[in-house]
From Swiss-Prot:
Residues 130-150 have a biased composition (Low complexity). It is found in: Nucleus. Interacts with SPL. Interacts with CRY1. Induction: Repressed by the miRNA miR-JAW. Induced by blue light. Stabilized by light but labile in darkness due to proteasome-dependent proteolysis (at protein level). The gene is TCP2. This is Transcription factor TCP2. The lineage of its organism: Eukaryota, Viridiplantae, Streptophyta, Embryophyta, Tracheophyta. Residues 130-202, 220-245 are annotated as: Disordered.
Length: 365
């Protein structure tokens, strides 16, 4: 078809004026051109043309086969622009185009209307650009507000972190102080035992005699009385009948601080004496002034059988009642040369129902 058109074109030297008049409608009808303002932005900045089906792009996309034929025709015609080759094709097909139905029923705007449309288009484009600018400004304001809120959140988070750090530091300091106080109190057994006795009362009377130094100033302490306690023993009875050695007694309490037993009124008057047998370590005896009526004595001794003879200590009793009954306690430790044995100190009560004469007979040597 393209070859036939070219042959016909070569045969005809002059083009009819009527054909030129028909083509002039397309060449000089500027009212159908829609120009796009550059302010609107985007890639599609070239003008469009108004057709019966609305504005259309001036650029045409061709298929692969049509594009090959078209560019071959353009090269054969010697045109440097594709639009000139399209114009030549339209002129060559004028007869066939005239046979097609007309578009008289289609209303196209005149030049005045086109100018008005261009003005409206420009105004619309300007309004779009202003709205875009305003939206950008609003977005920037919103972003600034968000940034402010983020900064406030960060400040609050930092403040909370500082508070947590200060709290943890305070707790660590408190724990360190408590540990230091515990060490200091452990270095002073008299004060620690005083605090322990004052803060930890118990129904068992022997809990107050777990240390050799309980009360160092002759203070009077009231303890609960338990008369229904059952006597128990962890060491055989022959230990009590073993002959005692001579001991030297040392008092931990000055004599002028020891109040008379009769003025206690049933309260405990604690006196501590250290007995030092020859090569047998040390023993401390504590006697109560009264208040217990079901116990004879308690003895803390080692399980090592070869040291029983040299370990028994002298008991000292301070009767406060007419019957002279009251608990007596004995504490002792093995010599240093026998420390390789499995030392386990045990405390026992026995003979809780003995009379006062037996107490007096066994309490003194």
């Amino acid at each position: 078809m393209i070859g036939d058109l070219m042959k016909n074109n070569n045969n005809g030297d002059v083009v009819d004026n009527e054909v030129n008049n028909r083509l002039s409608r397309w060449h000089h009808n500027s009212s159908r051109i829609i120009r796009v303002s550059r302010a609107s932005g985007g890639k599609d900045r070239h003008s469009k043309v108004l057709t019966s089906k609305g504005p259309r792009d001036r650029r045409v996309r061709l298929s692969v086969s049509t594009a090959l034929q078209f560019y071959d025709l353009q090269d054969r015609l010697g045109y440097d622009q594709p639009s000139k080759a399209v114009e030549w094709l339209i002129k060559a097909a004028e007869d066939s185009i005239s046979e097609l139905p007309s578009l008289n029923n289609t209303h196209f705007p005149t030049d005045d209307e086109n100018h008005q449309n261009q003005t409206l288009t420009t105004v619309a484009a300007n309004s779009l650009s202003k709205s875009a600018c305003s939206s950008n400004s609003d977005t920037s304001k919103n972003s600034s507000g968000l940034s402010l809120s983020r900064s406030e959140l960060r400040d609050k988070a930092r403040e909370r972190a500082r508070e947590r750090t200060a709290k943890e530091t305070k707790e660590r300091d408190h724990n360190h102080t408590s540990f230091t106080d515990l060490l200091n109190s452990g270095s002073d057994p008299v004060n620690s035992n005083r605090q322990w006795m004052a803060s930890a009362p118990s129904s068992s009377p022997m809990e107050y005699f777990s240390s050799g130094l309980i009360l160092g100033s002759g203070q009077q302490t009231h303890f609960p009385i338990s008369t229904n306690s059952h006597p128990f023993s962890s060491i055989s009875d022959h230990h009590h009948h073993h002959p005692h050695h001579q001991h030297q007694e040392f008092s931990f309490v000055p004599d002028h601080l020891i109040s008379p037993a009769e003025s206690n009124g049933g309260a405990f008057n604690l006196d501590f004496n250290m007995s030092t047998p020859s090569g047998a370590g040390a023993a401390v005896s504590a006697a109560s002034g009264g208040g217990f009526s079901g116990f004879n004595r308690g003895t803390l001794q080692s399980n090592s059988t070869n040291q029983h003879q040299s370990f028994l200590a002298n008991l000292q009793r301070f009767p406060t009642s007419e019957s002279g009954g009251g608990p007596q306690f004995l504490f002792g430790a093995l010599p240093a040369e026998n420390h390789h044995h499995n030392h386990q100190f045990q405390l026992y009560y026995e003979n809780g129902c003995r009379n006062s004469s037996e107490h007096k007979g066994k309490g003194k040597n």
